[in-house]
Amino acid sequence: MRPLIGITGNQLLEAVPAFSGISVAYTPIGFVKGVQAAGGNPLIIPIGAPETAADYIAKIDGLLLTGGQDVSPNFYGEEPSLHIGATFPLRDDFEMALIEEALKQKKPILAVCRGLQILNVQM
Protein backbone atom coordinates (compact mmCIF):
# COMPACT_ATOMS: atom_id res chain seq x y z
CA MET A 1 0.00 0.00 0.00
CA ARG A 2 1.30 3.45 -0.91
CA PRO A 3 1.84 5.84 2.02
CA LEU A 4 -0.66 8.68 2.38
CA ILE A 5 1.23 11.97 2.61
CA GLY A 6 -0.55 15.05 3.93
CA ILE A 7 0.44 18.21 2.08
CA THR A 8 -0.40 21.49 3.77
CA GLY A 9 -2.66 23.67 1.69
CA ASN A 10 -2.74 27.41 1.34
CA GLN A 11 -5.45 29.95 0.65
CA LEU A 12 -5.55 32.94 -1.66
CA LEU A 13 -5.78 35.97 0.63
CA GLU A 14 -7.13 38.31 -2.04
CA ALA A 15 -9.96 37.89 -4.52
CA VAL A 16 -8.78 36.76 -7.95
CA PRO A 17 -10.94 37.57 -10.99
CA ALA A 18 -10.37 34.10 -12.45
CA PHE A 19 -12.27 32.65 -9.48
CA SER A 20 -15.06 35.29 -9.44
CA GLY A 21 -14.04 36.46 -5.97
CA ILE A 22 -14.44 32.99 -4.44
CA SER A 23 -11.90 32.10 -1.76
CA VAL A 24 -9.60 29.37 -3.07
CA ALA A 25 -7.65 26.69 -1.20
CA TYR A 26 -4.69 25.23 -3.09
CA THR A 27 -1.22 23.69 -3.07
CA PRO A 28 1.41 23.91 -5.81
CA ILE A 29 1.18 20.94 -8.17
CA GLY A 30 4.91 20.24 -7.84
CA PHE A 31 4.36 18.95 -4.30
CA VAL A 32 1.56 16.67 -5.47
CA LYS A 33 3.63 15.30 -8.37
CA GLY A 34 6.68 14.89 -6.13
CA VAL A 35 4.76 12.77 -3.63
CA GLN A 36 3.33 10.68 -6.46
CA ALA A 37 6.74 10.24 -8.10
CA ALA A 38 8.15 9.06 -4.77
CA GLY A 39 5.45 6.39 -4.52
CA GLY A 40 3.03 8.14 -2.17
CA ASN A 41 -0.59 9.20 -2.38
CA PRO A 42 -0.94 12.95 -1.74
CA LEU A 43 -3.70 14.36 0.46
CA ILE A 44 -4.02 18.14 0.47
CA ILE A 45 -4.90 19.37 3.97
CA PRO A 46 -6.89 22.63 3.85
CA ILE A 47 -6.30 25.29 6.49
CA GLY A 48 -8.68 24.60 9.35
CA ALA A 49 -9.23 24.82 13.06
CA PRO A 50 -6.24 23.69 15.14
CA GLU A 51 -8.44 21.22 17.03
CA THR A 52 -8.86 19.21 13.80
CA ALA A 53 -5.11 18.60 13.44
CA ALA A 54 -5.11 15.33 15.41
CA ASP A 55 -7.71 13.81 13.07
CA TYR A 56 -5.72 14.72 9.95
CA ILE A 57 -2.43 13.45 11.37
CA ALA A 58 -4.03 10.16 12.47
CA LYS A 59 -5.05 9.48 8.86
CA ILE A 60 -1.71 10.17 7.16
CA ASP A 61 1.67 8.43 7.11
CA GLY A 62 3.76 11.61 6.77
CA LEU A 63 3.41 15.39 6.65
CA LEU A 64 4.79 17.76 4.01
CA LEU A 65 4.86 21.40 5.13
CA THR A 66 4.82 23.66 2.07
CA GLY A 67 5.93 27.21 1.34
CA GLY A 68 3.83 30.35 1.27
CA GLN A 69 3.35 33.47 3.33
CA ASP A 70 5.84 34.62 5.95
CA VAL A 71 5.34 33.26 9.47
CA SER A 72 3.89 36.01 11.66
CA PRO A 73 6.65 37.44 13.90
CA ASN A 74 4.13 37.48 16.76
CA PHE A 75 4.64 33.71 17.02
CA TYR A 76 8.32 34.09 17.84
CA GLY A 77 8.22 37.22 19.98
CA GLU A 78 9.20 39.82 17.38
CA GLU A 79 7.56 42.86 15.86
CA PRO A 80 6.85 42.97 12.11
CA SER A 81 9.65 44.62 10.12
CA LEU A 82 9.39 46.74 7.00
CA HIS A 83 10.69 43.82 4.94
CA ILE A 84 8.12 41.22 5.96
CA GLY A 85 5.79 39.86 3.32
CA ALA A 86 2.17 38.81 3.75
CA THR A 87 1.38 36.75 6.84
CA PHE A 88 -1.54 34.40 7.54
CA PRO A 89 -1.88 33.79 11.31
CA LEU A 90 -4.74 31.29 10.85
CA ARG A 91 -2.44 29.15 8.74
CA ASP A 92 0.35 29.56 11.30
CA ASP A 93 -1.93 28.35 14.12
CA PHE A 94 -3.18 25.38 12.13
CA GLU A 95 0.23 24.26 10.91
CA MET A 96 1.73 24.53 14.39
CA ALA A 97 -1.06 22.24 15.61
CA LEU A 98 -0.31 19.81 12.74
CA ILE A 99 3.37 19.80 13.69
CA GLU A 100 2.59 19.22 17.37
CA GLU A 101 0.34 16.28 16.49
CA ALA A 102 2.80 14.81 13.99
CA LEU A 103 5.47 14.82 16.67
CA LYS A 104 3.09 13.29 19.24
CA GLN A 105 2.01 10.59 16.80
CA LYS A 106 5.60 10.03 15.62
CA LYS A 107 4.82 10.82 11.99
CA PRO A 108 7.69 12.00 9.75
CA ILE A 109 7.75 15.64 8.65
CA LEU A 110 9.34 17.11 5.52
CA ALA A 111 9.41 20.91 5.45
CA VAL A 112 10.12 23.23 2.52
CA CYS A 113 10.78 26.99 2.73
CA ARG A 114 8.02 28.50 4.91
CA GLY A 115 7.35 24.97 6.16
CA LEU A 116 10.84 24.81 7.64
CA GLN A 117 10.34 28.24 9.21
CA ILE A 118 7.06 27.25 10.92
CA LEU A 119 8.64 23.97 12.04
CA ASN A 120 11.49 25.94 13.61
CA VAL A 121 9.06 28.33 15.34
CA GLN A 122 7.01 25.41 16.72
CA MET A 123 10.08 23.60 18.03
Across the structure, where does each feature detected by a protein language model lie?
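Catalytic nucleophile loop
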Residues: 116
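N-terminal beta1-alpha1 cap of cysteine-dependent amidohydrolase-like domains
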Residues: 1-112, 120-122
